[in-house]
Amino acid sequence: MAIPFLHKGGSDDSTHHHTHDYDHHNHDHHGHDHHSHDSSSNSSSEAARLQFIQEHGHSHDAMETPGSYLKRELPQFNHRDFSRRAFTIGVGGPVGSGKTALLLQLCRLLGEKYSIGVVTNDIFTREDQEFLIRNKALPEERIRAIETGGCPHAAIREDVSGNLVALEELQSEFNTELLLVESGGDNLAANYSRDLADFIIYVIDVSGGDKIPRKGGPGITESDLLIINKTDLAKLVGADLSVMDRDAKKIRENGPIVFAQVKNQVGMDEITELILGAAKSAGALK
C-alpha cells in the first residue's frame, strides 16, 4: 500500500525559501572613529527586509517577553465543529526531544478506545511517519505526512492550511475522535496556532541541560502542557531535575508540567489524563 504523503504544506506559494540578504550597515571610515549610516542604507535595509518577508513567507519578529501561560491564547470552542475536525492535539519541541515517541505511546494507549489519526511534519523527509508505521502505532492509512520544505513553525502557525486539509481528510475517512499533529523539530520560540491545535503539548528533554526551562519562549511558557522528557538521563548529563522543576513552575506560572520517560511509559498516565480531560471539557468527548 502506498504511504499517504503530502508534498509541501499549504498552497503552492507557501514554500519557504531562506534568502537572508540584509545590508544592515554601510560603514565609510575617513580617518575618523565613527560610523556613517545614511538614509539610503536604511532604505535599502528596509527593502531587503520586505523582500525577505515576501520570499520567506513570514517575518521573524522579535518577542518582547518569553510569553505567559496565564495570558496565553486559549482555544475558542463556541463555534468549533468537531464533526468536521476532531479535537486536535499539537505536539511540538526541539529535534530529538521525544515528540515521535510520544505520538507512538499516545496511539498505543488511546487507539484501542478512540478513533485516532496522525499528521507528521518534516522538512524534507517522512521519517517520523515511517517510524510510526514501522512500529504499528496505527494502521498506516491513518498516518499522514507533510513535507514543509522550510521552517517547521510556518506549517503549524503562519500557514496551517496544509495540516488542516490532511486532518479533515482523516476525519472524513475515519470519523476520528482525536487527531494528533507533530511539528518538525524547532526552537523554543515555535508554537502552534489555535486555528490548528486545541491542546498544545511542548516536549523538551534533559539532554540540553537544566537551563532549558528558564530560557522560556512560547513553546515552554504558552503550551497547555510541558513535558520534560528523558529524566533517566539527568545524572548522565549533569541536569538537576529539582532546578528544572523550580524554573519550569516559575516561568509557566504553575501551568501543567509532567516529568517523563516517554519511551518507558513513565508519566504517560498523567499525560493521557490531561489530554482526555481537555477534550471532554471542550465537549469533543463524552
From Swiss-Prot:
A cellular-component GO term for this protein: nucleus
Mark out the compositionally biased spans (Basic and acidic residues). 9-26
In residue numbers, the region (Disordered) covers 1-47
| Record-level GO BP terms | urea catabolic process; urea metabolic process
State the Gene Ontology terms under molecular function. Answer: GTP binding; GTPase activity; nickel cation binding
What SUPFAM superfamilies does the record point to?
A: P-loop containing nucleoside triphosphate hydrolases
Location comes to:
Cytoplasm; Nucleus
Sequence positions that bind GTP: 93-100
Under InterPro entries, the record lists: CobW/HypB/UreG_nucleotide-bd, P-loop_NTPase, UreG
Source superkingdom: Eukaryota
Q: Which residues form a coiled coil?
A: none
Pfam families, alphabetized:
cobW (PF02492)
- According to the UniProt record, which cysteines are disulfide-bonded? none
Q: Which UniProt keywords apply?
A: Chaperone, Cytoplasm, GTP-binding, Nickel insertion, Nucleotide-binding, Nucleus
What's the stated role of this polypeptide?
A: Probably facilitates nickel incorporation.
**Into which family does the record put it?**
Belongs to the SIMIBI class G3E GTPase family. UreG subfamily.
- What name is this protein filed under? Uncharacterized urease accessory protein ureG-like
Write down the species. Answer: Schizosaccharomyces pombe (strain 972 / ATCC 24843)
